Amino acid sequence: MKKLLAAGIIGLLTVSIASPSFAAEKQADTNVAVLFDGSGSMVQKTGGERKIDIAKKSVKSFAELLPKDTNLMLRVFGHAGNNKLSGKALSCSTTETIYGLHPYEGSLFDNSLSELKPTGWTPIAKALADTRKEFEAFDADGKNVVYLITDGEETCGGDPAAEIEKLRASNVDTIVNIIGFNFDVKGNEEMKQAAVAGGGEYISANSADEFEQAWEKEAQKFTE
């Protein structure tokens, strides 16, 4: 009996040493959330191509370049209602995770992106608040990075900088980066301040090439 007990203890110790705990695995996770502007202004063209199409291609390339074990989430905002007063309430109250927090799967990610059509207003603050809640519910330990893509300012009365500060102050350690697409000077300055509050950086892109290059550089940071 003593021999069997000793063998059992040794076996348990062997399993414990060979298999890292779930908590240890979770601590090593890298979680990336992309907040995607689907508001009506994204239908506008730059260099002959719609901003929404440029953004879709760039984000897809970014996702493909991430390390295979990176958890990726895609949340959209501005895609509900319409860009008139009749659709403002719905548009401003809706953000949606269209690709849940897990490693990149090409066809699933592509399908999620392909269905996105630029439609309504720009509830940036709500998108950030909903991301914080989702990260907290997921208990997202490890490295958490948020990328906010937008071509315009908050139009739903929210305060993006305040929501970024809440995200930073929560029990989820998160960095917020902002990629502004075709912003005016005033918008650039406001977004710079918001990115500083998020512990990240603000990247201004005024053309398709600049936007695509920005995402390539960001993807490289996860492999360095």
Swiss-Prot record:
Keyword Oxidoreductase: no
SMART domains to which the protein is assigned, alphabetical: VWA (SM00327)
Signal peptide from the UniProt entry: 1-23
Gene3D superfamilies: von Willebrand factor, type A domain
InterPro entries per the UniProt record, alphabetical: VWF_A (IPR002035), vWFA_dom_sf (IPR036465)
Annotated disulfide bonds: none
Keyword Signal: yes
Name of the protein in question: Uncharacterized protein YwmD
UniProt-listed Pfam families: VWA
Domain VWFA: 31-224
Protein species of origin: Bacillus subtilis (strain 168)
Annotated keywords: Signal
Family: To B.subtilis YwmC.
